From Swiss-Prot:
GO terms for molecular function: toxin activity. The keyword Transmembrane helix does not apply. This is Heat-stable enterotoxin. PROSITE patterns: ENTEROTOXIN_H_STABLE. Residues 20-50 form a propeptide. Toxin which activates the particulate form of guanylate cyclase and increases cyclic GMP levels within the host intestinal epithelial cells. Disulfide bonds join C54-C59, C55-C63, C58-C66. GO terms for cellular component: extracellular space. Keywords: Disulfide bond, Enterotoxin, Secreted, Signal, Toxin, Virulence.
Amino acid sequence: MKKIVFVLVLMLSSFGTFGQETASRQFGDAFSTPIAAEVNKKACDTELPPSDWCCEVCCNPACAGC
């Protein structure tokens, strides 16, 4: 009987952990895109980006190959 209770508790705790991981991954994906888009918009709206600015983020015309 103790083994059955132990197995049930273990299964429930594993399910809870898996559910939290899946939920946090979904929320992370949902929030990352708008934040990245907002950062790109603000960065690209600046007139003079810093010299070490990454071309992949803003496609800075000063960088070759954008």
